[in-house]
């Protein structure tokens, strides 16, 4: 036996989680539904590696001179830096650029997979999480952006989220850029200040207009005493930005009219408003006008969005960690990123896409009761009598017969006795167990114990003697009738579950 001091401590790295069977099944069930919708829209699957050359991630890294800042990086044997992918979009850009001549344009693809962030973990903030993306590369007009929004709406409804419980919110970075240009923040020299303005607007849902006003100005002091320095805009500029965020009207047409008034005279802003008007017409033509909303407060934080931006928001209330009722909020978003593939090509390559946060959407569906995997049935367990090694072949045949009939089954392969085997079957959520002792074998029979029915009856029989004598939920059948008998038990349990779920 190893010395106690030499024992390695089993510990999960911070910011990572283990996933148990129910979580895995729920995720696969959800992603299978998403794939069905994306396939219906004519998108094709593609998969890129978890690792990319660090320079392929480019400006999406917080600091290119410190490759481990923000991403997990290591050096190859040729001293080139490699990184675990930060998102699914930058790898797609590399893939498209590398295969540009052979791919159909527009290139419509979807992919899901793990992404990694080398950031400080916290509640609900992980270093590894799954995304599900769809992108169209090579389509310059806003019909591709509108399609992304419509596809997201269809996806949420296919997953069981009702109309009225979600909204796809749409804005256009060109409109905001027009506003920023109008207040004197044009050009690369004002990039940092523009980013501060974007971050302030992004806090609109959290802090409200007055909180954003403070963040656009000198700064905001929160309840804990922490001070966040503001963008230092003059009052007139603050009013202009707030007028932009408050331009939402009773419907899309009114919102667009309000935005036209805000950006009047600015060519870039007017171009953005026209793109929103074109998208609104497509939403109306497709019957999505009540599901997709033009909303000037949407500001995606990533710098590479160049035109329309969109966000999928769930509108129902949930209880947060402090016991407060809050709106669930965003489960995904995206937009147009015309500059991303162009980095590799040296020519304009328009692109647009949408990314779903898989874990967050799973949480939402569980809250709504739309992702129940409790109907997953454990395996039928064929028990092995103590030290009965010479009849293992017979037990194995029972398992094989059940599997051939499409029934999940396993033979107990541990070294414990019957009591421990029954406990094992219970932990495996087995619907029933199969038992064959020497007497049953001589008679060509097996015993089948319905564990679900047994649990129910055990609550009704309080007398141990009666329990032992009655052997509730246990039947004896001919060995060649095993499959049919097990199927009857499984069918009865399925009917009971269906009845209970009504």
From Swiss-Prot:
GO MF annotations, alphabetized: ATP binding; histidine-tRNA ligase activity
Indicate the enzyme's highest-level EC class. ligase
Q: At the top level of its lineage, which domain of life is listed? A: Bacteria
Q: What is its EC number?
A: 6.1.1.21
Catalytic reaction(s) noted: tRNA(His) + L-histidine + ATP = L-histidyl-tRNA(His) + AMP + diphosphate + H(+)
- Specify where it is mainly localized: cytoplasm
Which Pfam family, an example, fits this chain?
tRNA-synt_His
Q: Determine if Protease is one of this entry's keywords.
A: no
> What protein name does the entry list?
Histidine--tRNA ligase
């Amino acid at each position: 036996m190893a010395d106690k001091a030499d024992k390695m401590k089993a510990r999960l790295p911070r910011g990572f989680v283990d996933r148990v069977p129910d979580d895995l099944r729920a995720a696969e069930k959800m992603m299978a539904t998403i794939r069905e919708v994306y396939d219906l829209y004519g998108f094709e699957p593609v998969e890129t590696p978890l690792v990319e050359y660090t320079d392929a991630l480019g400006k999406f890294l917080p600091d290119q001179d410190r490759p481990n800042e923000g991403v997990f990086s290591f050096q190859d044997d040729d001293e080139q830096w490699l990184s675990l992918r930060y998102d699914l979009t930058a790898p797609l850009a590399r893939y498209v650029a590398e295969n540009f001549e052979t791919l159909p344009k527009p290139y419509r693809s979807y992919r899901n997979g793990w992404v990694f962030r080398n950031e400080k973990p916290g509640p609900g903030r992980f270093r590894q999480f799954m995304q599900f993306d769809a992108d169209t590369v090579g389509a310059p007009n806003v019909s591709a952006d509108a399609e992304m929004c419509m596809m997201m709406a269809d996806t949420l409804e296919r997953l069981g989220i009702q109309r009225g419980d979600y909204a796809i919110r749409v804005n256009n970075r060109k409109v905001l850029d027009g506003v920023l240009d109008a207040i004197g923040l044009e050009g690369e020299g004002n990039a940092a200040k523009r980013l501060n303005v974007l971050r302030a607007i992004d806090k609109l849902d959290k802090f409200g207009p007055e909180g954003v006003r403070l963040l656009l100005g000198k700064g905001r002091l929160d309840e804990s005493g922490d001070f966040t320095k503001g963008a230092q805009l003059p009052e007139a500029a603050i009013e202009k930005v707030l007028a932009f965020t408050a331009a939402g009207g009773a419907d899309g047409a009114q919102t667009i009219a309000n935005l036209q008034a805000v950006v009047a005279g600015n060519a870039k802003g007017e171009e953005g408003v026209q793109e929103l008007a074109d998208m609104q017409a497509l939403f109306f033509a497709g019957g999505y006008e009540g599901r997709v909303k033009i909303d000037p407060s949407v500001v995606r934080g990533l710098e590479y969005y160049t035109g329309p931006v969109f966000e999928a928001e769930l509108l129902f209330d949930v209880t947060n960690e402090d016991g407060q009722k809050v709106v669930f909020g965003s489960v995904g978003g995206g937009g147009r990123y015309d500059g991303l593939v162009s980095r590799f090509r040296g020519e304009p390559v328009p692109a647009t896409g949408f990314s779903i946060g898989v874990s967050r959407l799973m949480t939402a569906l569980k809250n709504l009761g739309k992702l129940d995997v409790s109907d997953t049935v454990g395996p039928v367990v064929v028990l092995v009598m103590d030290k009965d090694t010479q009849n293992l072949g017979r037990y194995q045949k029972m398992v094989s017969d059940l599997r051939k009939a499409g029934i999940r089954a396993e033979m107990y392969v541990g070294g414990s006795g019957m009591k421990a085997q029954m406990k094992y079957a219970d932990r495996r959520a087995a619907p029933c167990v199969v038992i064959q002792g020497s007497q049953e074998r001589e008679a060509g029979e097996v015993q089948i114990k319905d564990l679900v029915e047994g649990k129910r009856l055990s609550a009704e029989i309080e007398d141990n003697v009666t329990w032992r004598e009655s052997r509730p939920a246990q039947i004896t059948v001919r060995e060649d009738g095993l499959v049919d008998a097990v199927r009857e038990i499984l069918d009865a349990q399925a009917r009971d579950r269906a009845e209970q779920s009504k």
